[in-house]
């Protein structure tokens, strides 16, 4: 849940007049414009965007992004052969929130970080009891479907035969002012996902050159992808 984080941040949504959104205190815009040129999506049949429902809901962090990454990271960890495509698709859920005008890029980054921390903790605590059985069940089901459709006797063979980890897998050619590169193969999926890790935010210069340190449990998400590596190596691998 992002409830506690949102209550602590209490940052107005980007489509609101930020000069009027002080939440009981001062609101120094630091030279930024009070309003942005955001065109709200209109209601259409049963689709109601619900902008008014979010006026008192903090933009940071993005709850939708947190939910998407919570599932996406878990799925990528269980099927690491397709992790680049899975994570690129996951990143689109957050990117779309920027396009809708209901979140800032930093909100999306916060949602991803929160979901990553949640996954790390869960994989660390429940790896043997929940993660391994779930991964075995999922991979077994996919293998059975591959065999039934005559795409290969193993999951690896199936992925290779249908080119699921390349041009035959997930693609998305849609572009907008936020999504500037199409996903057309594994290499582009990696680039798109990597770009959305920071949205061009510069690195904190005070942290430049600092040694990488993974949070406790974070490396456990890689255990199925790299079972042969010692845990100490995972904890020191960016």
Identify what each model region corresponds to.
Residues 1-12, 16-19:
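Phosphate-/polyanion-interacting regions in eukaryotic proteins
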Residues 11, 19-211:
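Membrane-embedded catalytic cores of phosphoryl/pyrophosphoryl-handling enzymes
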Residues 235-238:
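Conserved small/polar residues in nucleotide/adenosyl-binding loops
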